[in-house]
Amino acid sequence: MGTIDWRLAQHVGELVSGIAGRGWATPPASSVGELRINPESLNAPELASRITAYTGLDPTDGVPALEPVDRPRWIAANLATMRPLLEPLSERMGGGLGPLSGMARSASGALIGVQVGALTGMLSQRVLGQYEIALLDPNPSPRLLLVAPNLAQAAQNLGVDREELVRWVTIHEVTHALQFGGAPWLREHLAGMLRELMDSMQIEVGKEGAGGLRDLLALSGIDGRPDVSAMREKLADLISKARNGELLRITLGEDRWQLVEQMQATMSLIEGHAEHVMDAVGA
């Protein structure tokens, strides 16, 4: 059994998803219903046919149905995808604890939970859509997610038509579905690099880290009401480290960072191709 506290990860993720800039704000009022995304009107299969005609990418299994979600559900979906990635790491970490107490084991699992929750919470503020695929687990079906509150907020900030924005984002994400479905080697290529990264990853909880973790756990209100004003500064620092890659770099070590850069290069190619297809097909 893994040691990662996934309940804490979801809790911290939802707290972080409400942070705006340096201050604390409630999540946007726009809900899935208020955005009124009608997946059927977007006609993802028809868009997929147009993308196939332009790119030659033809997935054998078609494309997933579009799913409008809010931030908590987006966080939950991504945490579920992370489980097969991080549970083996937590098992290795747990096996290395030896005679340490159950409290130390719980602290280690909570540390990963806080970090993963903060990362997904931060990303949940920015993601408009996502082709969600589990690279290391072939069993879950891929999903096409549209993050309704973020789409509503982006349309308002940019002063553009909501329906047009949703359509463009849909084209982008359907393109990702065809990239992976039409080029099966791509998934295994990324999965191979990811496996190597996860096999090399180590987590250690020192006294200093455990003290900071205890502070975060106390402030997060996992057992009661969160101390929002006090938690803001600590989470802002954690998010800052996540944004500049410091957390991941420390966790992996410099000798494995080259793999991260290789994955980033591959993802840049995938994203650039999707942007090109979006402009060509959506015009």
Question: What is each residue range found by the language model?
Answer:
Residues 1-56, 60, 64-65:
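N-terminal low-complexity, Ser/Thr- and acidic-residue-enriched intrinsically disordered segments
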Residues 2-15, 128-147, 235, 239-242:
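Acidic, low-complexity proline/glycine-rich segments
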Residues 31-34, 38, 161, 257-261, ...:
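Short, solvent-exposed segments of well-ordered alpha helices
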Residues 43-149:
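Auxiliary, metal-adjacent structural segments of Zn-dependent hydrolase domains
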Residues 113, 117-128, 181-282:
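Post-HExxH zinc-binding segment in Zn-dependent metallohydrolases
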Residues 154-156, 178-179, 188:
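Short helix/loop capping segments that flank catalytic or ligand/cofactor-binding pockets
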